[in-house]
Swiss-Prot record:
It comes from the Bacteria. The gene is lic2B. It holds the Pfam family Glyco_transf_25. Transmembrane segments: none annotated. It comes from Haemophilus influenzae. This is Lipooligosaccharide biosynthesis protein lic2B. Its EC number is 2.-.-.-.
């Protein structure tokens, strides 16, 4: 029987209470994994495992998030686990989530122990082009091959073989190529990624963007980082206006095409 690890800061009392309620409602066992935060400990771990991450163009919070996931991967590798289930502490669980998170037989039927895979339980409610690889559906959900890039690392299971290869790839990257952990997993490494559809979990902020109760310090930090912009000039204003027709066309395209490739949450 596997353990569902939920990455959470020890000080995130509201989020931990949320997870206790969310998982206990379906009798899903889990353990909190104390999330790393900007500190001497974080710096020490980065220096030991991924030195180039120190100079990556990420916020300190993003580096802490990166290493929290990475250290769980190392736990999978060091304890010789066939796979490890990892979640973040703002997830909402769908119906019958216990069938996927409290049982192992379905996963062992879908994949071999020697397979290299990352299986997303999460839907980010964005464009997610998938292919049917003829894996047997389970409990009303399909297991599809994810063929498009994606983002979000709030709910997934990763195999030991994938941990081994992805860790080696990450350690080979220069600081300029080290991105947020989810982008490396589902953009750069997407040849080994799969998607449960409909999604088993979703981040609160993706499902209820206008009614977020579980506020994120990481997201606040990221938005501050992104909001540092140069003063707009007449040239940039004119360029922006010239691009408006393209934006309108993109909206139409999203409605007609992209909406057909969104993994639903149920």
């Amino acid at each position: 029987m596997h353990i569902n690890y939920v990455i959470s800061l020890t000080s995130a009392y509201q989020r931990r209470e949320h997870i206790q309620k969310e998982f206990s409602q379906q009798n899903i066992p889990f353990e909190f994994f104390d999330a790393l935060k900007p500190s001497k400990e974080l710096t020490s771990l980065i220096e030991k495992f991924i030195p180039n991450l120190l100079h990556a163009k990420l916020t300190e919070g993003e580096k802490a998030c990166f290493m929290s996931h990475y250290m769980l991967w190392q736990k999978c590798f060091s304890e010789d686990l066939p796979y490890i289930y990892i979640f973040e502490d703002d997830v909402l669980l769908g119906e019958n989530a216990d069938k996927f998170l409290a049982e192992d037989e379905w996963l062992e039927e879908a994949f071999k122990q020697t397979d290299k895979f990352i299986l997303r339980f999460e839907t980010f409610l964005n464009f997610s082009k998938c292919k049917d690889k003829k894996i047997k559906p389970y409990s009303g959900r399909k297991i599809l091959k994810l063929v498009s890039e994606n983002c979000g690392a709030a709910g997934y299971v990763i195999s030991r073989e994938a941990v081994k290869q992805l860790s080696a790839h990450i350690c080979s990257l220069t600081s300029n190529h080290l991105l947020a952990i989810d982008l490396l997993m589902f953009n750069i490494f997407n040849q080994s990624t799969y998607q449960v559809s409909p999604g088993v979990c979703v981040q609160e902020g993706q499902l209820y963007p206008k009614d977020i109760k579980l506020h994120s310090q990481l997201e606040t930090e990221r938005q501050k980082y992104l909001s540092v912009k140069k003063k707009r000039t007449l040239k940039t204003v004119l360029i922006s206006l010239a691009g408006k027709p393209k934006k309108i066309l993109r909206k139409i395209y999203r409605k007609l095409f992209i909406s057909k490739h969104i993994v639903p949450f149920r």
